[in-house]
Amino acid sequence: VDCMSQQYDLSNKDIFTTTHYIKASKFEYDDVSLVDYIDNIWTVAFKMIANANDLIQHIEQTDAHLFEKGEMEKKMIMGEAYACRALMHFDMLRLFAPAPVNDDGQAYVPYVETYPDIHPESIKVTPFLDKVVRDLVKAKSLVADFDTTAAGVLASSSGKMRMSKANILAGPSFNYGDFFAGRGYRLTYYSITALLARVYQYAGKNEDAFRCASEVVEYGKKSGTLFYQDDFAGVTVNNGTSIADFDQKSDFKLKSSLIFAAYNEKAYEGAGIKSYFNLSSKTEDGTPLASNYFQLKRVELFTNRG
């Protein structure tokens, strides 16, 4: 999927010879080397959507007193489920349907809102995006009860706070359990707002997109940690591939500019990601080089960052 979204520099044909990565970057979905991958993306995405719908339907029927923090916690979980449903649908639309600027009026992807739904019908791009927006607006209002409180603001105030599994809210001032830690790995008020900005921009609703993006940026200013403070040293192609170059990377996972991230604890071993970080290459004097796999493509989005 990252190859499809043009995240990596695949221009060096001596390094990148794997056909399906190159085909994916060119959107050649019907290529025989890609078919199984495309089918798997579709299957996994709609399994996640089904799980979100199942959670929404069950939690709606659950009494708030069963949650440690009552109605606030119930609404937070429900909001995250709605946001997850919207996020997965939005990505499926971007992968498998034309963008609104090229909309041909055809139906491409179903928007599944109930569980189970064995044979959902595909719908057109515009009503599809309307459903994404509706789910995100609802999700944003549901998670606001926690994320806009003093505790919620603290939990999202910096990359370190957002991405830490340590429970910073466990003290006497807040007394929240581990469930409220690591908000950067959950769809919070500000990550939902940022996603809503993306959806609005994709739909051509630029004023709404600007309003949502401004809300996120202004929050970053108030918290003292800007979301757009980038540190790409040692990651992009132009920075070299020696061990020393990569050791200069002070924020390898770019936590400083992450609002939301998903993770899989088993991916490094189970999914074979480890193989992409082998130090197999060496210089003429035998010094090992960091892997050339999947170096990020540097794209400057703003001509003036002032």
Show which residues each predicted segment covers.
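Short, flexible, mixed-charge acidic loops at enzyme active sites
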Residues: P98-V112
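Flexible helix-coil transition and linker loops at the boundaries of alpha-helical arrays
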Residues: T62-K74, L142-S158, S164, Y176-R183
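Hydrophobic-face positions in mid-chain alpha helices that act as interaction patches
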Residues: S157-L169, F180, R186-L187, Q201-G204, ...
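Short coil/turn linking the two alpha-helices of tandem helical-hairpin repeats
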Residues: L93-P100, D147, Y202-K205
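TPR/Sel1-like alpha-solenoid repeat signature
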Residues: Y82, T193-L196, Y200
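Acidic, glycine-rich segments characteristic of secretory precursors and extracytoplasmic regions
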Residues: V1-D14, V125, V237-T241, D247
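Conserved, well-structured interaction surfaces
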Residues: T17-F96, P116-D130, L136, L142-V143
